[in-house]
Each structure stands twice: as structure tokens, then as C-alpha cells.
Amino acid sequence: MSFEFTIIVPVYNEEDNLERVEKELLAYSKIATKNTCILFVNDGSKDKSQAIIEAICERNNNFNYISFESNKGLSAAIKAGFDYASTALVGYIDSDLQTNPEDFNLLLEHIGEFDLVTGVRANRKDSFVKNMSSKIANGIRRSFTHDGMDDTGCPLKVIKADFAKRIPMFKGLHRFLPAMILLQEGKVIQIPVRHYPRIAGQAKFGLWNRLLGPLSDCFAYLWMKRKYINYKVAKHDL
């Protein structure tokens, strides 16, 4: 089977969630509007995640993995997924499954016209502190990037791979994916998706990661925006 769409699943110490991830993504792949494969990126997990991932990939032909030597963070895991994917479309979902894989089909409806389609979590099922810190962080980021996105941290996105592979990722830049597509003169849109409470495992981001960390990342983004090279080839004979 020729795959058209790769779902990247970053994993860090998610042993309690992975069998549910397998079940949900396997079910989604049967109803997906594009031929879909799954790529786990094990971000240096210290629990049994790697052994579980290998077992999942052994019994499913459309599941593969890469595994880091040590923990490098979510941005690195997403970047590695972009680099290793061989399909025309890439997307990602968190391994906590607080978003529904079936909603990828909602995003795929728009990927022909847009270069990045991101979910925006409707009726978020997180704590008051987490919701408020995310809203404040999104407001700060939006004032820097002017990307018009309300929920750039939503872990459900679809991107054309030729755009994704040109993103010069740095730590924290996963929050700026729509803005980085706009720097390439691409088109972005946000679509409401479902959101659920975390069932197992522990959240990897605290108040610092959600609020204070992104503020410093905004200045890194502004530096990159000034230095970013975006060229278009008019002609070639390659």
C-alpha cells in the first residue's frame, strides 16, 4: 500500500497510554480519507514505552518508530517526525489522546486549499489553571506572530510535508508552526475539534512551560523571522 499521510506520535513515558493509542489509531486508519501510517517518536522514555512501541510496530504493518538516545523535548520529536516521514502529508497527535484521531478527517477536508490545518480545542477538558495559562500564552504569542490562531498548542494538525520539512525547528517552536508556515507564504486555517480529559499518565508541561517559557520563545521567533530565508526558484534544469 502506498501511504499518503503520516501521523506522528511523540512519546515520553506514556506506557499506560500506548495500547489505547494503538487501538484508536488502528481504528482511525480504517476510516481515514487518506491512506495512513503512524510514526512513533520515542523521546528518550525511561519507562517501558519503547518495548511497547516495538511490540505494536511488530504486529501492525502501518506502524513504525524512531527512538532518541535521550530526551530532547516535544519540538525535537515533531521535527524528527517531519524529517523521517516519506508521505506528502504529515500530522501529529499527542499520545495522551486528549484529541480524537477521527477528527483528522475534518482537517484533511481543508488541506487541498491550505498548507497547514490545525485543530482548535472546543470545550477544553483541562483544569482552570491550565486553560487560563494557555489562553494568556496564546494571546502573547498571537501579539508577536499575528498568525490569527487561537489554540496553536492543539495537538492535532495536518501539514503539507514540503512545508513541514522546511521549518527550522528549535526548542519551543512547536507552538509556532502556523506562524512558520506563514513565513513560507503558506496558508493556514483552524478547525474546531473535540477535546477530552487525560485518562492515564502525567502531563509533561507545567505553568512555566505553558506561560513563561513561550514568552521567551516569542523573542526567538522574532529573531528567526528577521533572519528567515524564503526563496522561490523561477527556473531550473535539474
Q: What are these model-derived regions, one by one?
A:
Residues 1-3, 139, 146-147, 170-238:
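Hydrophobic helical membrane-anchoring modules
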Residues 20, 27, 51, 135-138, ...:
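Generic recognition of well-ordered alpha-helical segments
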Residues 114-165, 216-220:
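Short, flexible, basic/aromatic active-site loop/helix in glycosyltransferases
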Residues 45, 70, 125, 129, ...:
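Residue-level signature of the cytosolic catalytic core of signaling kinases
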Residues 48, 159, 176:
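Short Gly/charged-rich anion-binding patches and loops
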Residues 1-128, 162, 183, 188-191, ...:
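Structured catalytic core of nucleotide-sugar glycosyltransferases
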Residues 82-84, 108-109, 133-138, 206-209:
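Short, hinge-like loop/turn segments at secondary-structure boundaries
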Residues 20, 76, 99-102, 131, ...:
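Charged, alpha-helix-enriched surfaces in structured cytosolic catalytic cores
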